[in-house]
């Protein structure tokens, strides 16, 4: 599997706005199923962290006050990622924040997001649910640290993606795996996924 940048944001809410911003970002670079590089930073966007979010993530307003400005972090992380294809678990969420925070530094995303949640729904249908922690436990993958902190979640999503890639090769006979293929598989209706994968067998 080609080089992929797996991203996770911690935020103060669900939809980005002037009062709802990213508080932490982590990126792990996955290459041939292995994590080869990492970037992580808290980011100060000048917003207050609601109490329930602080309980969930352990990130407090006080921690953010001493963190680098969000714009500086996004410039760094944008340079770190470059044009590497992107992936996140529940990418619809992280994509919104990536685009919003990039927009604030006058940058535009050029690459697509693959989604390990959508892929797992299709490739791990017997899992009890498709939360990141559940899927990692179900697949017997290593515990990466505190859930709801960006680096632990990004590493979990990367390990899960490597597991899904192995499954595509071993169970479905796919030889050439690409980010484009992952992006196309996540759009196939779950009921038709096996039939769809048969057409790719041996390629």
Where are these regions (language model features)?
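Acidic donor-binding loop at a coil-to-helix junction in glycosyltransferase catalytic cores
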Residues: 152
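Conserved beta-strand -> loop -> alpha-helix junction used to position metal-binding or nucleic-acid-contacting
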Residues: 108-120
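Short, glycine/acidic-enriched loop or turn micro-motifs at the edges of active sites
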Residues: 11-13, 118, 156
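Acidic two-metal-ion nuclease catalytic site recognized across multiple nuclease folds
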Residues: 158-203
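Generic alpha-helical structural context detector
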Residues: 118-121, 133-137, 159-162
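Conserved non-catalytic scaffold segment of RNase H-like nuclease domains
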Residues: 1-111, 125-148
